[in-house]
Regions:
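Rhodanese-like catalytic fold shared by cysteine-dependent sulfurtransferases
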Residues: 1-19, 27-61, 70-102
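Short, surface-exposed ligand- or partner-binding patches at beta-edge/loop junctions that are enriched
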Residues: 64-66
Length: 102
């Protein structure tokens, strides 16, 4: 199974069907970002996630975003070990914003 996708791969998946996004950025520092219509974005700061696992559904696949995709890669491994289906989006919201601007 592929545990990471590029922004372009993520956008192709999101264009086909609604996706579940887990935005792990600090709410005080970062603005939320908008995805394709119908996508579900859950914002939980990275530092709070271990205490918020009850908000996640093990039957869903989540695409993880941090600002640059580094911290989300580490958290993806943690969540997989906890039984969740997660995929890291390489480059995070920075790459996502660059993709939209191009």
């Amino acid at each position: 199974m592929n545990y990471s996708v590029t922004t372009q791969e993520f956008m192709m998946l999101a264009a086909k069907e609604p996706v579940n996004v887990l935005d792990l950025r600090d709410h005080d520092l970062d603005e939320s970002f908008e995805l394709l219509e119908g996508s579900n974005v859950l914002q939980i700061p990275l530092t709070q996630l271990p205490n918020c696992l009850n908000q996640l559904d093990k039957g869903k696949t989540y695409y993880l975003f941090t600002q640059f995709g580094v911290r989300s890669k580490t958290m993806a491994q943690f969540l997989r070990n906890e039984g969740f289906q997660v995929t890291n989006v390489i480059g995070g919201t920075s790459a996502y914003q660059q993709y939209l601007a191009s």
